[in-house]
């Protein structure tokens, strides 16, 4: 049973009632672990948030608790909050255990994947978003990583998770939110120009997710951040390369276009989207959508290349965070600096570069926008090689200089 907390009031500090197990996922400020209630033996997922790393951001956690308390038991496609409390060092959000994995990991493990499968998944997302909007809640951070399956079964519920950036708002306050929030590639145009935003930002994100679900890459990938923002601001996208979209129906493309409408007032609402012919066809279109073409081969190729790069990006961000916090502190123990390494062909070998030479190397940067759109197999292998080389050299750049 969750601790009773009034709005704006901190959870009571108390001993942890759960024993944590294997790690299910991790971010910059938190880690999600499997846990078991010490008294009942029931298994859950615990989002463990380091209070020291969240200094100045505590409101995000309080907000997530408030949102989940209000909606988590009212819809089958929203993750259920079971408990919340804090210990001396951590904040805990305990939810039902979603064992089915993330959306795209699950898709890539399937033997086949058709447009009708995508429509079914988007319908479930829309149903949950319509429920949130009916309760005056804007999620503001919808993306594939925040969509989890309840169980590994084929008919498992798809769940919306991570309400840290969500907001509760009255109907007359529909467009008063002005803070920049969310994941840049999934932000709506009105978030960037800070003209005020509300429920339509979730529909924009659903359009992006749908596009991604049909090809394995995102529509606004550009060479620079500025070009990406400009493309989002004008909804400058296309259904290309043609070979990845040849098997996708016009109904699906129209649905995406109506979600990715620049003017939020002209964008579909969640309830309107649920009535779109692609989501709610007038007849059984299972055999018609995309002419029954299996979309999985192209999606796996594009998504796996994108995932390889983003794993490296997450590593860079995590290590940069460790730098900010004064060294390689892991679970309260100073990590021993491993031998520096680099990639020679396909082998990781000891790096004999001197500390002075390493100091003069260029700063490490990885472009987070790349998503392998339309890459050849050779280009993908080259990208993976570069990522491996970058990750292998990370540790040699993170140890305090006094230790080198």
Swiss-Prot record:
GO terms for molecular function: ATP binding; calcium/calmodulin-dependent protein kinase activity; calmodulin binding; protein serine kinase activity. Residues 279-322 are annotated as: Autoinhibitory domain. Residues 18-279 form the Protein kinase domain. PROSITE patterns: PROTEIN_KINASE_ATP, PROTEIN_KINASE_DOM, PROTEIN_KINASE_ST. Phosphorylated by cmkC on Thr-179. Disruption phenotype: Lethal. Its EC number is 2.7.11.17. Activated by Ca(2+)/calmodulin. Binding of calmodulin results in conformational change that relieves intrasteric autoinhibition and allows phosphorylation of Thr-179 within the activation loop by cmkC. It comes from the Eukaryota. Residues 301-323 are annotated as: Calmodulin-binding. Disulfide bonds: none annotated. The keyword DNA-binding does not apply. This is Calcium/calmodulin-dependent protein kinase cmkB. The lineage of its organism: Eukaryota, Fungi, Dikarya, Ascomycota, Pezizomycotina.
């Amino acid at each position: 049973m969750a601790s009773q907390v009034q709005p704006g009031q901190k959870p009571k500090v108390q001993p942890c009632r759960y024993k944590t197990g294997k790690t299910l996922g991790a971010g910059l400020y938190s880690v999600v672990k499997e846990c078991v209630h010490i008294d009942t033996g029931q298994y859950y997922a615990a989002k463990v948030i380091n209070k020291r790393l969240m200094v100045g951001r505590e409101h995000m956690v309080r907000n997530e608790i408030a949102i989940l308390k209000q909606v988590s038991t009212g819809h089958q496609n929203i993750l259920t909050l079971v408990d919340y409390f804090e210990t001396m060092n951590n904040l805990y959000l305990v939810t039902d255990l979603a064992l089915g994995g993330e959306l795209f990991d699950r898709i890539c493990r399937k033997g086949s994947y058709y447009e009708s499968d995508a429509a079914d998944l988007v319908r479930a997302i829309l149903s949950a978003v319509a429920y949130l909007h009916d309760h005056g809640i804007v999620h503001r951070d919808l993306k594939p990583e925040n969509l989890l399956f309840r169980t590994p079964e084929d008919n498992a519920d798809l769940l919306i998770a991570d309400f840290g950036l969500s907001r509760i708002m009255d109907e007359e306050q529909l467009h008063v939110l002005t803070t920049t929030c969310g994941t840049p590639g999934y932000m709506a145009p009105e978030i960037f120009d800070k003209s005020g935003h509300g429920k339509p930002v979730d529909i924009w994100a659903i359009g992006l997710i749908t596009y991604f679900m049909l090809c394995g890459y995102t529509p606004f990938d550009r060479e620079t951040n500025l070009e990406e923002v400009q493309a989002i601001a004008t909804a400058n996208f296309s259904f290309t390369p043609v070979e990845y979209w040849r098997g996708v129906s016009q109904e699906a493309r129209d649905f995406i276009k109506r979600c990715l409408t620049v003017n939020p007032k002209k964008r579909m609402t969640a309830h309107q989207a649920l009535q779109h012919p692609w989501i709610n066809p007038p007849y059984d279109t299972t055999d018609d959508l995309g002419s029954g073409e299996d979309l999985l081969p192209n999606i796996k190729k594009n998504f796996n290349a994108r995932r390889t790069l983003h794993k490296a990006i997450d590593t860079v961000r995590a290590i940069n965070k460790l730098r900010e916090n004064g060294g390689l502190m892991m679970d309260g123990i100073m990590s021993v600096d491993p031998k520096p390494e680099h990639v020679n062909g396909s082998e990781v070998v000891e790096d004999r570069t001197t500390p002075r030479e390493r100091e003069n190397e260029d700063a490490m940067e990885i472009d987070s926008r790349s998503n392998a759109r339309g890459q050849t197999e050779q280009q993908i292998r080259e990208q993976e090689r570069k990522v491996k080389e970058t990750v292998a050299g990370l540790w040699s750049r993170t140890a305090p200089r006094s230790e080198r």
